[in-house]
Amino acid sequence: MNRINELIKEYCPDGVEIRCLEDCCNLLDKKRKPVTKASREAVEYPYYGANGIQDYVSNYIFDGTFVLVGEDGSVITKSGTPVVTWAEGKIWVNNHAHIIEEKEGVMLRYLYHYIQTIDVTSLIHGNIPKLTGKDFKALKIAVPPLEVQREIVRVLDSFTLLTAELTAELT
């Protein structure tokens, strides 16, 4: 059992509601637009793809805080979980990443952590690995009460920060 599920079990011993991802957030995939490499100018705004920033461009199509999940290409980690990126500010996202925006009742940062624990190995298809929109929308999300989500995010963000600090000190 991973840490997030341990925390859910600890804080919600009677269980939590399980929802499909599409019921937990706003999915913005229809607003994505690819930009050819030749059309990109290395300027101000991050241009995101399946596994993070690919380049920089002169304009943006999103402004806010988002979770990006790889759709095709480099979409799965060695442990079988999705490639997930936290993105803030003015950004452009191509058609190789799913885009999640917060919806009332489920914290975006909670989804960021939770999605990283889901084994999607059986959902990845094709010669070029792909997590289809249909499969992505149907991912099952354990949704504890907001106060529990806040505590889980606090614990996991603290752990992430400590891990980064230790890694920096060791290198």
Q: Where are the regions that the model predicts?
A:
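A short beta-sheet element
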Residues: 49-51, 57-116, 125-127, 132
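Short amphipathic alpha-helical linker/capping segments at the junctions of internal repeats
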Residues: 43, 90, 169-171
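Short, recurring structural edge motifs at helix starts
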Residues: 5-11, 33-35, 125-128, 138-143, ...
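Amphipathic alpha-helical segments
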Residues: 1, 15-17, 137-171
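Functional cation/ligand-contacting sites centered on basic and imidazole/sulfhydryl donors
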Residues: 1-4, 24
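Short, intrinsically disordered, mixed-charge
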Residues: 26, 63, 116-120, 158
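Non-catalytic DNA-recognition/assembly elements of restriction-modification systems
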Residues: 8-32, 38-47
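Generic structural signal for secondary-structure transition and capping sites
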Residues: 29-33, 53, 120
